[in-house]
Structure formats: C-alpha cells, structure tokens
C-alpha cells in the first residue's frame, strides 16, 4: 500500500535534497533517461558512431577475452531502502524542543523525509564516483543489485593518462627556480580540445603551489564576470576556486564518499586533471524496473522514489529510491589525468 504519491515524493526529493558534486555539475550537464532497460548510445544526439568496450569481471579481474565493443548495454541498478521503524516515532527527535514535543505523526513524516535524503545521497555518491572515474581514467566498473560487475571502457588514449616519475617528478624539482607551466602546456597537448580548467586534490594543489613561479603567476583576484568563474561559484565546502593561471581556472576538490562506513576521497592524493567545462559528460539512465512505476507510466526517469506499507502482522513501512545510472563521456580524450609525484 502506497503512503505518499510518487509525484509528492519526487517534488520533495527535487526541492529539499540537492546534492551537487563538482564533476557532475561542471562536466556532466546532459541527462538522458531511457524507457528501456538498456542504454542506446545511437539515440543520444551526436553519438551515432560511439561504442564502448565492456568486459565482464570475475573474481575481481577484468576478462578482456570475453569483452567486446557495444553501443547498447544495461546499467547497474541501485535501490537504497530504509524501514520506517514505529518505535522511532515515539522518541524525541534530536532538534525537538523538550518543552514542545512533536506528535508521532509529525516525527514519522520527518523520518520518511530523512530516509529519502539518505537514499538520494547514496545514489548521488554512486553517480559522482562514476563521473570522477570516467574523467580520471576513461573507464570504470559498474555494479548493481543482482548485476554482475562489468568494466565500461570509453576508449581513453593511453597518452591522456600520465604518471610522473623520476626526474620529471615535481617533488624533485627546485621550488625556487623551476616553472611547471611548460609541463602543463605539454600535458594539455594530449587533450582533444582546449583546456580551461585544472582540478587538483588538496595534496596535488599543495605541491603545485609550492613553486615560486606558480605563486607569481596565479591570479587570485575576484570580481571577474567570465562565464567560467560564474560556473565555479557556490560549489560548496568540498570545492575551492583558487584563481586563474593564465586562461585556465584552478580548482581544488576535496569531495568524499562513504563506503562501508569509511569516508574516502573521490580524488586520489597527488592528482591533477586537465579538462574543459564544455566537455560533453552524459548522465544516462536505464528504465525503472518496478511494477508500481510501470502502472503509473513512469519508465524513463532518473529516479523513482516510493513509500509503502507492507501489510502483515505486524505491518511494516518502507522507503526506497530506485535508479539505473551510467555516467559517460562523449569524448574521453577531452581530459588529461596526471598522477603527480
């Protein structure tokens, strides 16, 4: 038995629970939900000839011999779920005034909305993780419930994934005399387009700014009306806009996700990513595989939230949001990923 309508849940989800990580916001602005279980690249404008290399993963290893190129595939399915425990409605909520206690009906509503906030955050973390991996390496492993892990390879050129080593390592350079600008310009030549943004993790940024030449060239003045700076404003606590390095924006990203109750950084230590804010990052979604959604005519959607009571002795109430996300890059070579040393 449904408690809130899907329209009500979608409205609450969209208005209350905005989660906007850096890579999704800056690089993945196009959204394509499909009404089929599979995602068809040929149906996305401008991607008629695009195909991905997909390989099954068995016991943690990619089986390339069983892989192949495809332009249609099934995304992993995610559906975080919570139970609305009746006992929780009898306890005072953390922000409740002890002198003005709320009734159980109000608490139940608050618990439902908090559950949905947590479920939305869980899915958004998956989307951002896929987006970051696509930008960093041009491939990632997609997983889902009752879904065999599969590596999705977008075909990034080997020269676009760079690892500093030996004498080329910035850590071995003289911080007073060396200018890393030439290195950056050389790396940028591997990109298929113009580079207008560089994203560092905090440790990568600390290494970059340790050079005297960087401190002299970095323009930290605010007040620019450029489209790029406007796009980088108000990105939250996990993002810091450091200024312009020539005509390239410098951004530091310290975003995290939670895996097995442990906080982990999206960007590995000593990471530098060169890219363009006009790159075509694609948020694609397979259809919602739920009988209730089909009865309501909801097939092509990025999310399907639901709240229902399962009758029985006793009856139990649940919340859940379903999604089948797959983040893709139309051209993975628009980015150059550098592992600093």
Curated annotation (Swiss-Prot):
<dbReference type="Pfam" id="PF03864">
    <property type="entry name" value="Phage_cap_E"/>
</dbReference>
<dbReference type="GO" id="GO:0030430">
    <property type="term" value="C:host cell cytoplasm"/>
</dbReference>
<comment type="similarity">
    <text>Belongs to the lambda phage major capsid protein family.</text>
</comment>
<feature type="coiled-coil region">
    <location>
        <begin position="109"/>
        <end position="129"/>
    </location>
</feature>
<keyword id="KW-1035">Host cytoplasm</keyword>
<dbReference type="InterPro" id="IPR005564">
    <property type="entry name" value="Major_capsid_GpE"/>
</dbReference>
<keyword id="KW-0167">Capsid protein</keyword>
<keyword id="KW-0175">Coiled coil</keyword>
<comment type="subunit">
    <text>Homomultimer.</text>
</comment>
<keyword id="KW-0426">Late protein</keyword>
<dbReference type="GO" id="GO:0019028">
    <property type="term" value="C:viral capsid"/>
</dbReference>
<protein>
    <recommendedName>
        <fullName>Major capsid protein</fullName>
    </recommendedName>
</protein>
<comment type="function">
    <text>Assembles to form an icosahedral capsid with a T=7 symmetry. The icosahedral capsid is about 60 nm in diameter and composed of 415 major capsid proteins. The assembly is primed by the interaction between capsid assembly protease and portal dodecamer, and major capsid proteins assemble cooperatively to form the procapsid with the help of capsid scaffolding protein. Major capsid protein forms hexons and pentons of the icosahedron. Viral genomic DNA is packaged into the procapsid through the portal vertex. The packaging triggers a dramatic reconfiguration of the capsid shell.</text>
</comment>
<keyword id="KW-0946">Virion</keyword>
